Design a protein with these regions (language model features):
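Domain-level signal for soluble alpha/beta catalytic cores
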Residues: 1-513, 519-851
Length: 851
C-alpha cells in the first residue's frame, strides 16, 4: 500500500505533496508483476498467467428473485437478514463446478448503502456466506458507485477512489482472495476502482466493463480502449460482463484479445429478458446454447468465463464441462504504442510507420491570449483550443499550462478534465512538475503520454516511477546535465540511457517516444542534419518511436511554414512518428496528408482525396494577386463533424460544446433576433444535429453532454435578458428511478438534455414509490413520464408504476430506459416508448408534444 504524490482536500481539489524518496526510487511506483501478488494457489496463478481456465459463478439477481426476494429489497442487506438464502444460491454454483464465488457486495459502497449498513459489515457477512457455501475462491465484488464522475457529474475522481478504497480494505479484512470490478461503463470510474485495489491490497484484480449494442459503453468506450487502459493501469485479468448474450459478445472479446496479452474474461447474459406469466423476469438462452456460444470465445482465446443476468448453476455446469476439456493457448499481441482517450485509440505499431500529429497549441509559451486565459481561470479558452486542433486534424493534444503565477497542479487537473469532456482526442500531459504530472495522469480516463523525461538522473528518478505506476507512455528528451549535445551520437547515447533506465521500471521501448530536440536553423544550421541522423539511430537500434517539435526549426527566419514543412518531410523520411506541431498550419498538414499517401498509411489515398478534391495549385493562384492574398494565410481547412454548422455561430458553438463563448454570441444575436426564433431556428437544430452525430457514432455521451451544457448557457442568457413569459414552455415531463432502484445516472442525463430542449422537468429522484409518481403527474398535469431501472429485480416495480399511471391517468405517455431493458421488454411491461439513450428521449418528447 502507498499514498500517491497528490493528496486532496474534502472537495476533491488536488494539493501538491512532497515527493517521497522511497517512491521516487521506485520502491512503490513500479510496474506491478505477478510476483508482487498474493495468490492463493497455483491454480489461480495459472489463470492469471493465462495458462489455465477459471470459472466464475453466474447471475445472482434472478436467482434471488426466484428465491422470493421482495421487489425493491437491497440485495446486500440479505447477507444479514437472510444469509442462508445467499449461501444456498452460492452452494448451487459451487456444486456446478464454479471456481470463484462472487461475494454479494456488488452495491456495497457507502454511497449506495446510504447508512443502511457499514461497508465493513456487509463485506464480512457476504464473505462468510460465500465461505459457508464451500467456495474455493471468494471474489470481493465491486460495482459502480451509482453517480456520474466529473465533468459529466459532480463526483470527483478522488471521492470515487475513496469509496472504492473503503470497499477494498473491507474485502481484505474479510478475507477475499481477489477482487472483481464489474458492470462498469465509465472508464475513469473503472480506473479509480483498479487503483484502489492495487494501492490498498496485494490481491489479484479482475476488471470488466459493460457494452451496449453499438459495441461501446454507455460513455462511449470501445473494447480496445477498455482493454488497453485496464492493462496499462494494472488489472490482472480484464474483459466484459453483462451487456448482451454470449454470441453478441464474441466479437467484442475478440477485439480485446488483439490489444492485450492479459487474460480476457467474459460473463455474458443469458440473452434477452422478458416477463413470464407469473410476473417473473426470465431469459431466453438455455444452458446448451449458452455453452455453445461461449465455446467460440474460448477457441478465440478467452480463458476466464462465467455468467451474468439470467444465468444459473445449470449454465455454469455446462461451462465447467467445456473448460475441463480445453487448455488455453499462448497469446502474443503485436507490440505497438497505444495512446487513448476514453473513446479513441491512436495506435503506432512497432512493425510499421504510422503518423500521429500532436497538437502544440495548448502551451502558454509565446501565446499572450492563452497566458491571460490561464491567469483568469478561463478554461473555456483552453477547451476551445483543443476543439479547434481536433477539427484541424490533430490526433493527440499536448496540454501544458505551466505559468509561475498559477497553481499548476490544480489547473492542469481542471484543464484535462474539461478537455476530456469536450474532445475525443488522447492527451499528452506536458509539465516539468512531477506533482502536476501525477495530478493529471492519475485522474485521466485512458492511457496518456507524459511529456517528458530526460537524461538527468533526478528527472528520471521523479518521472519514470509515475510512468510505471500509471502505465503511461513517455517522451524522452535527449538532454542531460550537460545540456543538448551537438552530435547525433551523443543524442543517441542519452536516448539509450533513458531506455535502459526505463527498463528498470518495467517500461518497454514500445511506450517511449524519443525527442531528439530541434534547434533553430537560424543559429544552429548544421544541427538539422544531426537531429535527423540521431532520430534514425534511435529508430534503428532502440525500437522506440520518435517525436519532434518541428516548429522550432524555422524560428527567427522568414516564410516559417515553408521551411518547417520541408524539414517535416525530411523528418518523416528519417523515421519521425509524432510531430509536435500546429495542426492549423496548412503547409504542415499538407505534408502530413501527402506523406500518409506515400507511406501507404492512407490506404487507397482516401483521406488525401477527401481533403484535396477540387484543390487549386497555389503557384497558379500566385499569378492572380487577389487570389494570392486570400490564400496567403496558411490556415488549414477544418474537416470535422461540425462542418455543417460553420455558417451559424450558435449552431457551431453548441455542436462543438463551446460554452465559454456562447453567452456573448447569444446576447449579440438577441439585439436583432426574436428569442423564440433564436431557440427554434438555431439552438434546437443544433441539438438535433448533435443527436444525429451521436446516433452515427461520431459523438459520444461526453460530447453530447458538452453540447447540452453549451445550449444551457445560451438558454440561460436568453431567459436572463427576455421578459418573463416571452419564452414558451414546451411541456412538462416527470422523471424517476423506480422503487427499489438507487441507480440514477441515466435518468440524470436525460433530465439535463430535456432541460436544454426547453422542457420543464420534474425530477423525483431514485427509489420512487409508484404513488409518488402518480401524485406528481396528477398535481402537475404532466403528459410524459420517464422511468429508469438498472436492476432486473426492480423491473417489477417499473411495471407496477406503469399499470398505476395508465389506470389513473389514461392520457399520460411513459418512456422507459435502463440497462436491463430493450424494446420488446418495454412493450411487454406496458410502456409506450423505449429510449436506448438520452438523445432518443429528446426525440420522443418532441413527438409527444408535437414539436
Amino acid at each position: 500500500m502507498f499514498t500517491p504524490l497528490i493528496t486532496h482536500d474534502p472537495d476533491g481539489a488536488a494539493l501538491a505533496a512532497p515527493v517521497d524518496a522511497a517512491r521516487r526510487n521506485g520502491a512503490a511506483y513500479k510496474t506491478r508483476t505477478i510476483d508482487d501478488l498474493r495468490i492463493r494457489d497455483n491454480r489461480l496463478r495459472a489463470a492469471i498467467e493465462g495458462t489455465g481456465h477459471l470459472l466464475f459463478d453466474g447471475g445472482m439477481g434472478t436467482m434471488l428473485q426466484a428465491a422470493g426476494m421482495k421487489a425493491g429489497a437491497l440485495p446486500e442487506l440479505l447477507n444479514f437478514e437472510e444469509p442462508q438464502v445467499i449461501t444456498d444460491i452460492q452452494r448451487q454454483y459451487v456444486e456446478a463446478g464454479c471456481d470463484v464465488i462472487t461475494a454479494n457486495t456488488f452495491g456495497a459502497n457507502a454511497h449506495k448503502l446510504d447508512g443502511a449498513a457499514t461497508v465493513a459489515d456487509v463485506f464480512a457477512a457476504a464473505v462468510a456466506c460465500a465461505r459457508a457455501a464451500g467456495a474455493r475462491y471468494v471474489a470481493g465484488d465491486i460495482g459502480p458507485i451509482g453517480a456520474l464522475l466529473r465533468p459529466l457529474g459532480t463526483l470527483s475522481f478522488d471521492e470515487a477512489y475513496d469509496l472504492f478504497a473503503e470497499e477494498v480494505r473491507a474485502g481484505v479484512d474479510a478475507g477475499v482472495d481477489l477482487f472483481i470490478i464489474e458492470t462498469m461503463t465509465d472508464l475513469a470510474e473503472t480506473k479509480a476502482a483498479v487503483l484502489a485495489c492495487r494501492e490498498n491490497s496485494d490481491l489479484p484484480v479482475f476488471a470488466t466493463m459493460t457494452f451496449e449494442e453499438d459495441g461501446r459503453t454507455f460513455l462511449g468506450t470501445s473494447p480496445e480502449v477498455a482493454a488497453i487502459t485496464l492493462d496499462a493501469i494494472g488489472a490482472d485479468v480484464l474483459g466484459i460482463n453483462c451487456s448482451q448474450g454470449p454470441a453478441e459478445l464474441r466479437g467484442l472479446a475478440a477485439r480485446m484479445l488483439t490489444v492485450t496479452d492479459k487474460p480476457v474474461m467474459v460473463q455474458a447474459n443469458a440473452g434477452l429478458p422478458h416477463v413470464d406469466d407469473d410476473g417473473n423476469t426470465v431469459f431466453d438462452i438455455q444452458a446448451p446454447e449458452y455453452a455453445e456460444a461461449v465455446a467460440g470465445m474460448i477457441e478465440d482465446g478467452v480463458s476466464v468465463v462465467g455468467g451474468c443476468c439470467g444465468t444459473t448453476p445449470t449454465h455454469m455446469a455446462a461451462l465447467r464441462t467445456l473448460i475441463d476439456n480445453h487448455t488455453p493457448s499462448p497469446r502474443h499481441r503485436k507490440p505497438s504504442m497505444s495512446v487513448t482517450s476514453a473513446q479513441t485509440v491512436v495506435d503506432l505499431p512497432c512493425d510499421g510507420h504510422k503518423i500521429a500529429v500532436i497538437g502544440e497549441r495548448i502551451n502558454p509559451t509565446g501565446k499572450k491570449r492563452l497566458k491571460q486565459a490561464l491567469r483568469d481561470g478561463d478554461l473555456g479558452y483552453v477547451v476551445s483550443q483543443g476543439i479547434s486542433q481536433q477539427e484541424q486534424g490533430a490526433d493527440i493534444l499536448d496540454v501544458n499550462v505551466g505559468l509561475p503565477e498559477i497553481d499548476e497542479v490544480k489547473v492542469i487537473q481542471q484543464a484535462t478534465e474539461q478537455l476530456q469532456g469536450s474532445t475525443l482526442l488522447p492527451l499528452q500531459i506536458d509539465s516539468t512538475d512531477p506533482a502536476a504530472v501525477e495530478a493529471a495522469v492519475r485522474r485521466y480516463a485512458g492511457k496518456p503520454i507524459i511529456n517528458s523525461v530526460n537524461g538527468k538522473q533526478q528527472i528520471m528518478d521523479e518521472i519514470l516511477p509515475l510512468v510505471a505506476h500509471y502505465g503511461t507512455n513517455v517522451v524522452g528528451l535527449t538532454l542531460d546535465e550537460g545540456g543538448i549535445p551537438d552530435t547525433a551520437e551523443a543524442r543517441f547515447a542519452i536516448a539509450e540511457r533513458i531506455v535502459a533506465e526505463a527498463a528498470r521500471y518495467g517500461i518497454g521501448p514500445d511506450r517511449i517516444l524519443i525527442d531528439c530536440l530541434v534547434m533553430t536553423a537560424s543559429t544552429n544550421q548544421r544541427q538539422a542534419e544531426q537531429i535527423l541522423r540521431a532520430m534514425s539511430l534511435c529508430k534503428e537500434h532502440l525500437g522506440v518511436k520518435c517525436a519532434l517539435g518541428v516548429s522550432n526549426i524555422s524560428f527567427g527566419l522568414p516564410a516559417r511554414p515553408l521551411l518547417g514543412s520541408v524539414f517535416l518531410a525530411a523528418a518523416f523520411g528519417a523515421g519521425l512518428d509524432a510531430p509536435i506541431m500546429n495542426p492549423g498550419s496548412k503547409r504542415f498538414m499538407d505534408t502530413v496528408y501527402s506523406y500518409r499517401v506515400l507511406s501507404a498509411e492512407d490506404e487507397g489515398s482516401t483521406g488525401y482525396i477527401e481533403r484535396y478534391a477540387g484543390w487549386t495549385d497555389p503557384y497558379k493562384i500566385a499569378a492572380n494577386p487577389a487570389a494570392a492574398q486570400a490564400a496567403s494565410t496558411d490556415a488549414v481547412p477544418t474537416v470535422s463533424a461540425t462542418a455543417s454548422a460553420d455558417d451559424d455561430p450558435i449552431r457551431h458553438m453548441v455542436v462543438s460544446g463551446r460554452k465559454g463563448e456562447i453567452a456573448a454570441e447569444t446576447e449579440r444575436l438577441l439585439a436583432d433576433h426574436d428569442a423564440m426564433d433564436l431557440i427554434n431556428n438555431h439552438f434546437i437544430p443544433a441539438l438535433d444535429e448533435v443527436g444525429v452525430l451521436f446516433d452515427q457514432g461520431k459523438f459520444f455521451l461526453p460530447q453530447l453532454m458538452a453540447s447540452a451544457e453549451a445550449a444551457r448557457v445560451g438558454f440561460d442568457t436568453i431567459k436572463r435578458l427576455m421578459p418573463a413569459g416571452e419564452i414558451a414552455d414546451k411541456g412538462k415531463i416527470c422523471v424517476a428511478t423506480v422503487k427499489g432502484d438507487i441507480h440514477d445516472i441515466g435518468k440524470n442525463i436525460v433530465k439535463m438534455l430535456l432541460d436544454n430542449y426547453g422542457y420543464t422537468v420534474f425530477d423525483l429522484g431514485r427509489d420512487v414509490d409508484p404513488q409518488e409518481v402518480l401524485k406528481t403527474v396528477q398535481e402537475r398535469d404532466i403528459k410524459l413520464v420517464g422511468l429508469s431501472a438498472l436492476m432486473t429485480t426492480t423491473v417489477v416495480a417499473m411495471e407496477e408504476t406503469i399499470k398505476l399511471l395508465h389506470a389513473e391517468v389514461p392520457g399520460v405517455k411513459i418512456i422507459v430506459g435502463g440497462a436491463v431493458l430493450n424494446p420488446e421488454y418495454a412493450k411487454q411491461i406496458g410502456a409506450d416508448y423505449y429510449a436506448k439513450d438520452a438523445a432518443e428521449s429528446a426525440r420522443i418528447a418532441e413527438e409527444v408534444f408535437g414539436q
